Regions:
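Formylglycine-dependent sulfatase
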Residues: 2-9, 14-195
Length: 195
């Protein structure tokens, strides 16, 4: 499920790094990679890992048909640095991105991170998407970005396509009309995650 894509992604990162001078992979030999990263989800929140409170049949089905990643930890306790670490393979401290974007603003300004903190993922950082493109993958990003404004959106970080992304990361509302950069067509009452 969630972790399956991470394991596949890591193996393809290694292939992409060693394939700089090699020809692109044959279309039939490439694996499809689906990487799902969720905010605020504990490993025991999925039924495939033992939850009796939450029912997660679709994720359970993905987990049963793929690999389960059971020995890892999150790079940070909040979204932006974790997402940046997954995309680049670097720790949040090396990226100077150790808090969620616009984190700890008023009334918590006294707790704000140091001045060296970046509030975006720099373009010079090579992302997993850029490495996968080097070996012929088409890349797509859907959902919360939260790694910088429009000049740092997924399409500037190696993703061919991006949908439902805003500067703050979430669509603002899940009911139509969606105030997102690449708006979808819809009608009153449509719910974004039902699409």
């Amino acid at each position: 499920g969630i972790v399956t894509a991470l394991v596949l992604g890591i193996s393809h990162v290694a292939q992409a790094q060693s394939a700089a001078a090699k020809p692109q992979l044959d279309q039939t030999s490439r694996l499809n990679i689906l990487f799902i990263l969720t905010d605020d989800l504990g490993w025991r929140d999925l039924s495939c890992y033992g939850s009796s409170f939450y029912e997660t049949p679709n994720i359970d089905r993905l987990a049963s048909q793929g690999m389960r990643f059971t020995d890892a930890y999150a790079a940070a306790t909040v979204c932006s640095p974790t997402r940046a670490a997954v995309l680049t393979g670097k720790t949040p401290a090396r990226l100077h991105l150790t808090d969620f974007l616009n984190g700890l603003e008023f009334p918590h300004a006294a707790l704000s991170p140091p001045d060296w903190t970046r509030w975006y993922l720099p373009h010079e950082e090579v992302t997993l998407a850029e490495m996968l493109k080097q070996v012929g993958y088409e890349t797509f990003y859907f959902g919360k970005w939260h790694l910088g404004g429009e000049e740092h959106f997924p399409v500037t970080q190696g993703f061919d396509h991006s949908l439902a992304v805003t500067q703050a990361g979430w669509p603002g509302t899940y009911f139509y009309p969606w105030p997102i950069v690449r708006n979808l067509t819809g009608k009153k009452g449509d719910y974004l995650t039902d699409r």
